[in-house]
């Protein structure tokens, strides 16, 4: 009987990166790592520039040297498309969408969730997904789909701190952790003050 396909959801943050490292270290089946890049417009990535450089110049080449195939997904729509698009239903129909709201980000749904869902529909039945959720994130672990989603961090007893240290020791810790404890687009409405400060100080072209 042929084994199911195994994929790792990978943002190239510490938890998903550590998941891939654990899979390789323990001989867990892994067919590919899947990354979805949100775009600001057709040319500019939504990733903080340091993280995007890390992904394409360090992380993806490292995974490929390990024998891990990396799939990069992008939505047809960009942040600018959504910002300038018009609402098509409801009492605000016809109005320009403009800025995304905290806790209700259309960019997350249209530019990340949908391309991932489309890709998942192309996978064979029974595909198993590794997700980067640490042992000390119990609320998130409880939401995993039994049998279809697996946390290798939980399986091998790794906390978020352990994941950070594993990536650091492997030379695969994103530089964004120097100024933030989370990943996210540089235009994210949920960005914390240190992230906004970093953007203003180091990427004034994006701030403007």
Regions from the PLM with identified roles:
Residues 1-208:
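Nucleotide-activated chemistry modules centered on ATP-dependent adenylation/adenylyltransferase
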């Amino acid at each position: 009987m042929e084994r199911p396909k195994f994929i790792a959801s990978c943002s190239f943050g510490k938890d998903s990166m550590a998941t891939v490292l654990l899979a390789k270290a323990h001989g867990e089946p892994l067919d590919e790592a899947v990354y979805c890049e949100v775009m600001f417009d057709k040319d500019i990535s939504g990733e903080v520039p340091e993280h995007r450089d890390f992904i394409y110049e360090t992380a993806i080449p490292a995974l490929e040297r390990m024998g891990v195939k990396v799939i990069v997904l992008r939505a047809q729509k960009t942040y600018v498309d959504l910002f300038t698009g018009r609402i098509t239903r409801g009492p605000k129909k016809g109005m320009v969408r403009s800025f995304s709201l905290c806790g209700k980000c259309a960019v997350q749904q249209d530019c990340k969730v949908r391309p991932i869902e489309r890709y998942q529909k192309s996978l064979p039945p029974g595909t198993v997904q590794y997700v980067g959720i640490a042992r000390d994130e119990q609320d998130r672990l409880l939401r995993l789909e039994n049998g279809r989603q697996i946390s290798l961090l939980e399986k091998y007893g790794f906390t978020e701190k352990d994941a950070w240290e594993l990536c650091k020791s492997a030379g695969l810790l994103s530089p964004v952790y120097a100024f933030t404890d989370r990943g996210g687009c540089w235009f994210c409405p949920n960005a914390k003050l240190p992230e906004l400060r970093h953007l203003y100080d180091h990427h004034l072209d994006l701030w403007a």
